[in-house]
Each structure stands twice: as structure tokens, then as C-alpha cells.
Amino acid sequence: MQEYHIHNLDCPDCASKLERDLNELDYVKKAQINFSTSKLFLDTSDFEKVKAFIKQNEPHLSLSFKEATEKPLSFTPLIITIMVFLGAILILHLNPSPLIEKAMFFVLALVYLVSGKDVILGAFRGLRKGQFFDENALMLIATIAAFFVGAYEESVSIMVFYSAGEFLQKLAVSRSKKSLKALVDVAPNLAYLKKGDELVSVAPEDLRVNDIVVVKVGEKVPVDGVVVKGESLLDERALSGESMPVNVSENSKVLGGSLNLKAVLEIQVEKMYKDSSIAKVVDLVQQATNEKSETEKFITKFSRYYTPSVLFIALMIAVLPPLFSMGSFDEWIYRGLVALMVSCPCALVISVPLGYFGGVGAASRKGILMKGVHVLEVLTQAKSIAFDKTGTLTKGVFKVTDIVPQNGHSKEEVLHYASCSQLLSTHPIALSIQKACEEMLKDDKHQHDIKNYEEVSGMGVKAQCHTDLIIAGNEKMLDQFHIAHSPSKENGTIVHVAFNQTYVGYIVISDEIKDDAIECLRDLKVQGIENFCILSGDRKSATESIAQTLGCEYHASLLPEEKTSVFKTFKERYKAPAIFVGDGINDAPTLASADVGIGMGKGSELSKQSADIVITNDSLNSLVKVLAIAKKTKSIIWQNILFALGIKAVFIVLGLMGVASLWEAVFGDVGVTLLALANSMRAMRA
């Protein structure tokens, strides 16, 4: 579907009606409007006809491919209108002479027309299309009817305060939209393309693969690429949530959206902007807010019946009692108008999507990206969670946990020999040994003269350090060189070490459990998760050790299809939605089959594509945060629904009893909408 920006769309109910009208057109396959971001997603065979339809039915709206600069809303006209209105009322009551009454009548009529301009025009547009239940038409009918029953001061006051409420509603919506735009603004706006000795300013979208771009200090990398010249530090916080800068030099891969902190870089473009990391982050957030939750779908359908129902009730209040001699028509029409004032479903229609929008926005600022708002609803119902082990519950970073010397050698010697043999290796196991050697022995690797270095695939390394031959690897490596050695029973990866054909001992290397893993599971229990399980392709001993530490059940040595099958059984056992958290390629099928699949940001691209939620900062505590956000968002939305319906029901009853006035009924409509909007904004701070 093609994406368009809709300008001047400031009414949520109008957005729903326009979406419905567009979907009824023969030449439109699908139309979807995101009121929160003012975007139209359109699949049509005739775009010009769509434009003409919108121009005819909503002439104040316009479409464009690019977002227009938003004009700031001005309080001045509103304040002047209110001041003139209050001044006229004050003069009228202080000096109620016939001349003053006539003069103030014309002033109030002018105030009515000025403040109600949008309502009056909108009402006539709606009536022309046969939309008799349009909120503008109902407001116009209510104020005119109030005028004819002698309540012309209240008629004008309703229009003034309704318009004031609409203005404040626009302001609140505008601010919420800016919150999303603040997230989108992490994407770079410009790129400096190198053409010979010149730099040309272009949009990142216009860059092509193999182009060379120059990124100065303080600027953002426009697209994913590789450094061809220069060395610097990059801040990748916008992509991963990590605050630690990353050092890059020639041949280093860099991500679009990263901030250059230290020196000028020349980067060769590897991906088009639409395929870059930052574009995917922005797209994920926007796609999430485009989707409608089940609650929102229900409210949209409910609102279509709500307005006619309230209008019917108001009509019955106005007509039936006088027919049975229970009072005058003027009295009961006035009471019916009070009920009519609360017929607009705006508080419901706008607060639900903005509540979810706030939840998605709050999550994104914490490094949690959602692919749809439906996951917020499902998360609140989940009772079970299963984890992959390596890279999810563990750091995926190897660490020396034990050194076992043999044949009279010391731990220090075993570690020193192993480190010497692996100085030229970049394998994670080799790096963990080098790190341990630096920490324990303060060994200076630059003093070692390494010769004849050889990596034996799947087994280990062989290297000559000065005049000594060192071999480090698994049992197969030692067997190949006919070196006798002792068997090991420890859990983890074993690196055997031989020095000049003599076995000196072995090193145990284990993956570390994440620092926040235990705390995460404890906090998840507080959030209502009752059942925990580890599903791993690793061997039983390694998985069992982690499971015992965390206190949860486990299944080990699983193939990808077995992992999916075991997860399905785990989920069915507890008869409630279940979450799966993983990061590897073998996790993708299970992530896709889970009620909510959560992919860790440093995992494989396939796992992130299969997940409903991507945690960019790789922190397990983000699981706790996203559950808390989901629950708070749901709570806020249902507060809005119950509050709006409750207040409106109260005013219908008060109108029937003749207790409430039209002034007070304005609060039942506009006031409730504003309070619901303000409450929805709390989700942004979840």
C-alpha cells in the first residue's frame, strides 16, 4: 500500500468515517487511516479519483507524499472570542436594558458564528452527504434548538466552550503526534555524497549502493555501510539503547542512524536507506501504531451505534413527556438537548488509539520495538514464558571459569601457554582466554613472537611461540598430535593445552548467565507470570545448570522443530497465552508460533523478523518493562472507556430529571474528551 500524509485531519471520528467511506469505493482495495500519525495507507487502482472524492467530501483535507511543516496552534483567536463572550454576558447582566439586550444579541450572534464556523461548515458538509448523526450536525441542531427555547446565552456558550474544547483536543493530539515524530527524528535528514573532490548534499533516500558518503563529527551515519577511510567513535544509542560508544576504523561495518562522535569518516554505502537499520526501527514503530487493537475495533463499531442510540433517547425525552401532559415542550426539549450534548463518541474514539500509541511510544524509548498494538493486549493475558538459553538468558560471551593443571604445571602456566597460542585468533573462545590472561597475569601479548600459526577447523590452534610449540584445542586436537591427556567431566567448553608435546592441563570456558536474569524472573512473577521454561539446543548439562540457577523447568538438545513442538505443549498445559523469548536462527519457528514472540536485538536477523517485539538493548529487564507498559496501557484505556460512558450516562439521567443544564452538559462531552486525552498521555510515561 502507498503511504500518504493527510493534512488538517484533527477529528478522530471524522478519520474513522473517512476510512469507512474510502473502503466502500469500488476503485479502493483497502484504505487505512492512522489518526495518531495523520497518515493514509491506500491500495487503489485510481488515485486521482480518490483525491477527487476527498476533495469533494472533505475539502479542508489534502494529501501529499511528504510531511508538511506543522503550523503552531495559536491561542489568540480563542482567547479573544472567550473574552468578547464573557464581556457581552457581563454587560447584559449588569445593564439589562432593551437597547443593550439588542446590541449584545448581535454580539453574541457574531461570537456564535466565529466560534462555530468549523462546526457549521462541517455540519452542512455532513448533511449534504446524508450524515445526520455527524457530531457537527448534532451540535448545530442542539445549539439552534436551545436558541428557539429561549436559552440563547447557553446556546452561544455551548458553541464557545465546545470550540474551546475542540481546540484543546487538537493541541493534545498535536503534542502526542510530536512525541512520535521525536522518535522518527533519530533518522538522519541529510547525507553528504562525495563526487570527486566535492560534497553534494542529498537525502539519504537518494543514496545508492557503493556511493561514498562523508560523515563529519556530530552528524549521523545516513545508511548502513562500511568505513573506507578514517577512525572514530559512534554512538548507536538510537538503535540499541546502549550508551557505550563503538570504535570503528577501516573495514568496520556501521549502522545508519549512528552518531559520529570523534573524527571524519568516509563510508561506502552497502544498503539502500529503506533497507537500513534506522529505517527498519522507524518502520516498526509506525507499523505498530497503524494497526488497530481488538479494543479499538470494538469501540469503533460501538460508536456507530452509540450516537444514534443517544439521539433516539434525547428525542424520546423531548417528545414523550409533553404528550402525556408531564410539562411543556420547551422544558422537555431543553432536557432532551442536555442528553443530546453527550451523543458524540469522541472521548471513546480518540482515547483508545492514543492510549495504545502512548504505550508503543513509551516502549520504543526503552529500546522495545513492537510490530503491532495487539501484542499489548495479549501480554496482559499471558501467564507463561519460555526462553532460549544461549544469547537470551546467557550473555553469549565466553568466560574462563576454571583452570585445571596437570603433570606438575601451575594454573598460571596453563593459561599463559593457551593465551600465547591464540594471540592471532579472533574466535570468541580465544578472546576469552586472552582476556583472562590479561586480568590474571598482566601478560603483555606484544612480547610474544608468534610463528607458524595454524587454525585447525573444529578442533583448535597450533602455534610456535619463540622456539616452543603450543597446541590448544579439544580432545580430537590432542589425539591428532598423539598427546596423552586426562578426561574432563566439567560442564562447559574444554580447551586442552600441550607445551612441546607435553600435556599441561585444560581450561573450562562457560557462557555467563546475564546479570539481570535472576532479577528478571523474580520481577516477571510479580507481573503475573506463573510458569517458566528453558528450551535449548545446547547439551543437557549446560542447560540444567542454568535452569537450576533460575529455578525453572528445562528441555535440552532440541532441534528447531522440536523446540516449537515442546513450546506448544508447554503453552497448552497452562491454557493461557504464552510468550517465547529467543535470539537465534533456530528460534525463528518458535517465535512465529508463540502468542507473543520476543526477539533479542543482538540476535539473528531471522529471529527478529519472526518476533512480535524486538528488544534492541538486549536487556532481560526490558521484558519486565514491556509487561508493565502493557498493563498500565490497558488500565488507562479501560479507565477512559468506563469514565466516558459513566459520565455520559450520568448526564443522560440528569437531563431526564431536569437537574443538569446545557452548560454542564458541555463538560459531559468536551470535558470528558479532554480528561480522557490527558489520561491517555500517561501511557507515554509508562
Swiss-Prot record:
Phenotypic consequence of residue 69 to A: In strain: 69A
CDD domains xrefs: HMA (cd00371), P-type_ATPase-Cd_Zn_Co_like (cd07548)
Cytoplasmic side: 1-72, 125-131, 175-308, 351-635, 682-686
Stored PROSITE patterns: ATPASE_E1_E2, HMA_1, HMA_2
Positions annotated to bind Cd(2+): 11, 14
Active site: 388
Catalytic reaction(s) noted: Zn(2+)(in) + ATP + H2O = Zn(2+)(out) + ADP + phosphate + H(+); Cd(2+)(in) + ATP + H2O = Cd(2+)(out) + ADP + phosphate + H(+)
Superkingdom of this protein's organism: Bacteria
Entry binding sites for Zn(2+): 11, 14
GO CC term (a single one): plasma membrane
Effect of residue 80 to V: In strain: 69A
Extracellular side: 93-102, 152-154, 328-332, 658-665
EC number: 7.2.2.12, 7.2.2.21
UniProt similarity note: Belongs to the cation transport ATPase (P-type) (TC 3.A.3) family. Type IB subfamily.
Protein name: Cadmium, zinc and cobalt-transporting ATPase
Species this protein is from: Helicobacter pylori (strain ATCC 700392 / 26695) (Campylobacter pylori)
Lineage: Bacteria, Pseudomonadati, Campylobacterota, Epsilonproteobacteria, Campylobacterales
